[in-house]
Amino acid sequence: MTFHGDAEYASEPDGMSKSGAIGLSRDNVPFSHGRAIFINPVPFKPSSTSSSVYSFKTSFYFVISPRPKNPNPGHGLAFIIVPNDRNDSASGLGYLSLVNRFSNGNPKNHLFAVEFDVFKDKSLGDINDNHIGINNNSVNSTVSKKAGYWYQSKIEGKNRWLFKELKLSGNGYRAWIEYENGKVTVTIGRSQEKPKRPLIEARVDLSKVFLEKMYVGFAGSMGRGVERHEILDWSFENSAKD
């Protein structure tokens, strides 16, 4: 991994991140933000001119923890796929170390992200202070949903789908993100067992977002509210042939 901004790998308990976790921001520094990027680029298209995009899937366990003496949340973290392993003048606050107010929405960003947001920023179109969203080249999500998962329960002899909200701030969860044939699914749960119904299922055209090779990792940021943003484990694979 390469680390940018305030992100780091905590090999020892240091007050910022749990031992062995990837920390994306410093929980004692307001407005802290950073990125942790896998060191090698990953192929996402057969060629630079191809309109085909390789399918991919990733799973990770994350924890967002506000400090006890400063319970204000801010702002969240994101799984990211980006064109390089630098931070490129990205900003904190609601920009989540993805873009800044000048670059937000620029198609040249070549950015795909799934955000786990714990602060409602009206100027960026956030639906609430506890949501998950899909972002292309922008922190303004193309689709977002209240954080939680679907489960089935038998009611009056019939199986019904019920929704359970999950509070992102102050808890740890496992997330699954998958892309295949132009469709992105995002699922979140409390355990290793993946819920059968995704939280988000959306058609997303990544053919113009992705370059032939991209970098994969995480980003996180804070405002005046301070909290830990940690990744405790992570797996990623795609359909590209070695």
From Swiss-Prot:
One term of GO molecular function: carbohydrate binding
Keyword list, A-Z: Lectin, Phosphoprotein
InterPro entries recorded: ConA-like_dom_sf, L-lectin, Legume_lectin_dom, Leguminous_Lectin
Modified residues (Phosphoserine): S207
A Pfam short name: Lectin_legB
Domain of life: Eukaryota
Annotated region described as Legume-lectin like, given as residue ranges: 3-237
UniProt similarity note: Belongs to the leguminous lectin family.
Protein's name in the database: Lectin-like protein At1g53060
Species this protein is from: Arabidopsis thaliana
